[in-house]
Amino acid sequence: MSDISKYAGIFPAFYACYDKDGRISPEAVRALARYLLDKGVKGLYVGGSSGECIYHSVAERRLVLENVMAEVGGRLTVIAHVACNSTADSRELAAHAQALGVDAIAAIPPIYFKLPPRGIAKYWNDISDAAPDTDFIIYNIPQLAGVALTIPLLKEMQKNPRVVGVKNSSMPVQDIQMWRDEGVIVFNGTD
């Protein structure tokens, strides 16, 4: 397991940045990353809900992350959300994120079809395997993903040595304490 101290502090969700024509703006991405760095945040969570990840193509998601890393890579801890409806696309984004040097990747469970816990674990582990030198963070957002992280599923995922934490967007304080008691880092936020 990596040095988890790099995950202490404030990690804002990175918002989507567009130009006047509605396309990803590399300049605006870099400006926002620089602004957040200058404000003293410890890290960034890139490509999550606030980043409108589900609506972006793989190419757009790569472009955002490339520009974030070009601006703040090595100076901030960067977590890249890489989940897509396609496991292959998720794996591509995971490998790309690792190649760029992110600190961790994260993923929501598969959406639309509700998979059993073993199917969710396989999906997450397949993604994690595409970035074998990168930490993995489970993104728990049941109000949008349609499935909540359970302790048995968390324990199954903890068999993967790359799993270091949970990004919790489900809000109940009991969840935060429950997962912390299981020895994982918990990021909490509604994004």
How would you describe each model-predicted region?
Residues S2-G146:
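Active-site beta->alpha loop and helix N-cap motifs at the rims of alpha/beta catalytic domains
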